[in-house]
């Protein structure tokens, strides 16, 4: 992670969780002059940070995600050996959501009727990323057999890897 990697490289520390880290005197969160209703769509790292900062500034915030839990890709990342500390990051955000008063709506699809019904002043889309397909010729024919896998297939235990593995991408 950038927090330690940058320090060891004698660069300014940065943080995946706290965008102000290393810039506390420059990046100040001022109270909002006009309180607004925000919908933040996506409860991954970006959505969590956005929702809590907006609420901290005095806005009314609904955080919507179709998943049953917060975290987005962090829920996969913390399954990687040596990356278990991401679970602590999610614990931190759960607490921040409580303290800042963000209204968390899990299992909620944020389609147009839902967003219109919410009468939001602003909508922030923080829906995250999907894995890039390296478009290897012939790979599509091998996916169903488990011979070509995405990282989520392995981390979620859908398939086991054999003794010989090539990582591409």
Predicted regions and their residues:
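Beta1-alpha1 glycine-rich phosphate/pyrophosphate-binding loop at the start
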Residues: 40-103
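Beta1/beta-strand and adjacent pyrophosphate-binding region of the FAD-binding site
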Residues: 34-46, 163-169
